């Protein structure tokens, strides 16, 4: 029985834990954060071979010299196997609130019930102790109300605001035992803050990214649509093709999600800070909501933070972690991410291997027929975009014809993205002359980029046929196609950039 003929619950009830996973390529992309332990060509090649698609640089740490070495090593690793181009992502530090320095670098123990002062007075920036703690957000006394909670050090310390003493000082009560230390992060849940989208450091980091031709920006602590517009302005003309992926990690970002989604290229569900800003028990609800809205909009969405965290030190993940990865894929995530597992972990390659295999199992458990019908039913008609109309029709034809792949000839990557939106059960092979667009296509589930380097032929149709043939040749090497398989080809009607308006059924030769 086809998946479109049964309800979602019936489909799940029919799954088998001894599922025979077909020998298909994984469709969900994997982001790996690179740290000193993994920043070498040999390890990067191993990570790629295990399943890494995107190299992430965390600009909360490291010098420009270090990040330059990551870029250089990633490109060297990518060049060893052009069949699998690696994308490079720059993750901004973003606007943060931090405590000051303690006197002499000493840690000061504090107990539940203890009362102290939080101050924005610069005189205490390097004189924090168990009586006064400096906060570097000048407007904290203006935005926070008595009774609100302030978290410090990733939520390890919790304080309740008792009263506003004056324009620079808050009186707070300690909610749990702990210690006051230097330069710890501060979170203000349920409080709207007016921090700028980009610090001066972030702006310099973005310029570094533009100079080095990074493929995408993971923009931290995005709170409103205007933040995205500001980032685009800083990237400027030279960086206009860099994709912006907004990290949602606070209540403001969740509240303004729809307007952010309208202007961004994609979303990352950043569950670390989000789980401090909103109750941890509500994070999975926010995750499902954001993934669903991204799927409906046809924009890529990544799920991140603590996915296989135990593998930082252990050779095998916990069962809960594996379920977390699998369920993120079932929710509809286009990408899943590793952080400490690959920056400092003892088992980085094993972590990627587990993540890749779990994603493949989850993908094999999806009722593609009913999913396509559901996505098609959610589209507002008539479709305003000719390319999307063609993509929808092509996927429908692929189902009826039992085609084995969709070959997309693309300049911008937009057609492949729109095909991915409808979650076809077969791979999308994107053939493009633009290496950056090829690398960026890793943002979309089920898209396999092929870089075609030959110059255009004067005869448009001959050039089309040459690109299709090359795409099929590369698909053979990726074990996506066999000669004689039916394929759907999507192309434009004329040369150059424009709408994709033609699809045809043919045979891979």
Curated annotation (Swiss-Prot):
Keyword annotations of the record: ATP-binding, Glycolysis, Kinase, Magnesium, Metal-binding, Nucleotide-binding, Phosphoprotein, Potassium, Pyruvate, Transferase
One GO CC annotation: cytosol
NCBIfam families hit by this protein: PRK05826.1, PRK06354.1, pyruv_kin
Keyword Nucleotide-binding among UniProt keywords: yes
UniProt record, GO biological process: canonical glycolysis; glycolytic process
Protein name: Pyruvate kinase
EC number: 2.7.1.40
Cofactor(s) listed: Mg(2+); K(+)
Disulphide connectivity of cysteines: none
Residues the record lists as binding K(+): 58, 60, 91-92
Binding site for substrate: 56, 272-273, 305
Organism listed in the record: Schizosaccharomyces pombe (strain 972 / ATCC 24843) (Fission yeast)
UniProt: ATP binding residues: 58-61, 98, 184
